[in-house]
């Protein structure tokens, strides 16, 4: 059963979450959307545009509004885009509350943080994405499943790398070369994919560590099918400093000391 789930995870992770048939959110898109949740604005190094908001990016759940003096400001988005009712648009928050979309979740968060009258529940000021899809009762993460998780995840990542290479979406020639090595070496096929995924997650910011926030793009799509992934990955933070180093990541996923290498 669990290996069948691993196959499902591969299909989920290796394909886009938004396509013509199933409107899901891709890992990279999800990471981009969550990158500036609480940011007010970000200036781009381009020439000033006529519209002050053109050069400013607001956090998710917010929109740029031109102030009375012509200055761009970020306000809670007035209305989220209307959707067609696809259940895959729904998201589950960390308080087990289902929202119509990511936009609605972070609009509510924004309104509540600013103590707006439109805020439905004050405690939603700290709400954030838990996983994609409507909230539901998740399977129990047993000790047995947790113990098996490192090997299953390493194998899953290897399959994901192979699929991305086939689709020419495995960025950087170095990873393609390492994958070719791994395909002919049983030991390396559980080493290189683990290091690759660490580098994929360590982007916002790229500081040679992975925060719990940076884990969201990998946990949010998978939690509904694999309840062990979040507690397992959070447990990789051995020193409880809020960040997972490459050594913590490698050790957590079963790599030996000499196999953990910095390649980001």
Swiss-Prot record:
Coiled coil: none annotated. SMART domains: FOLN. Disulfide bonds join 53-64, 58-74, 76-110, 80-103, 92-135, 141-228, 236-252. Residues 52-74 form the Follistatin-like domain. Residues 1-16 form the signal peptide. It is found in: Secreted, Extracellular space, Extracellular matrix, Basement membrane. Expressed by body wall and sex muscle cells. Probable association with basement membranes. Residues 224-259 form the EF-hand domain. One of its GO terms (cellular component) is extracellular space. One of its GO terms (molecular function) is collagen binding. Keywords: Basement membrane, Calcium, Copper, Developmental protein, Disulfide bond, Extracellular matrix, Glycoprotein, Metal-binding, Secreted, Signal. Residues 68-137 form the Kazal-like domain. InterPro entries: EF-hand-dom_pair, EF_Hand_1_Ca_BS, Fol_N, Follistatin/Osteonectin_EGF, Kazal_dom, Kazal_dom_sf, Osteonectin_CS, SPARC/Testican_Ca-bd-dom. Has a high affinity for collagen. Affects nematode body morphology and mobility. Essential for C.elegans development and muscle function. The cysteine-rich region could have protease inhibitory activity or may provide the framework for a protein binding module. Probable role in skeletal morphogenesis. This is SPARC. It comes from Caenorhabditis elegans. The lineage of its organism: Eukaryota, Metazoa, Ecdysozoa, Nematoda, Chromadorea. The gene is ost-1.
